[in-house]
Structure formats: C-alpha cells, structure tokens
C-alpha cells in the first residue's frame, strides 16, 4: 500500500512538472522566444529550456508548484542548483559552439490546472566569479 502511494505521488509530481514546462514553453513562444531545446541532457547534466531571445541565449529553469504554502517556487533554486545549471550550460555551449551572450532566467508556474500563475524572472542569477 505504501509503495503504491509513493509511486502515485511521484507520478503526479512528474506530471505537474511536465505541465509546468509545457506552459512555460507556450508562455515563452508567445513572447517571441525561439525554443532551441527542452530537457537537454548530457550525462547527468540537464537544462529545462534553452531558448533564443533576440541576440541572447536564455537558459531557463522552470519550477512548478501546486501552491505557495511551502514558499515560492524560485526559492528552491539554491547555490548547488545554480552550480549544476552553470555546468550544464558550459557543456551545452561547448557542444553547440554557441557564441552569444547568455542569461539565466527562471519561470515559476503555480497551480494544478489552467489558468496557471506564471512568472518570468529574467536575469534571475548571474554566474559567480570563482577564484
């Protein structure tokens, strides 16, 4: 019984995330973004959405939540997640030989069915300067 509940919960979580990413793509396309890749992977590295916005490459992390009872979706993006996004972006840029300015955006999607609350946070974070 517990195993079934856990599997069902994980499936619902995955489905919600997928719907959130679908909504984010529609939102971006409506704003004129050209979607280059969704769920791009290279080994363990992964990027939710890579898009072109004019002359910039936008790397977009999508966070979807049922509600904000436990905080805002963007608060789930911590330093560790940012490091993973940066490493994944580096792999992406090298593979496709991208020579564009890069920015890192976040799109939050809140709700379980339309209409969702969607917020786009351009330039949500900058790569840290490591020594």
Identify what each model region corresponds to.
Residues 28, 47-68, 77, 85:
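Conserved catalytic cores of phosphodiester-cleaving nucleases, focusing on short active-site segments
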Residues 1-38:
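Acidic-basic catalytic patches of nuclease active cores, encompassing PD-(D/E)XK
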Residues 42-45, 114:
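Short acidic/glycine-enriched loop/turn segments that link adjacent beta-strands
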Residues 44, 57-59, 101, 118:
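Structural motif
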Residues 95-131:
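Domain-level recognition of nuclease-like catalytic cores that cleave nucleotide substrates
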Residues 70-102:
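Mid-chain, well-packed structural core segment of small domains
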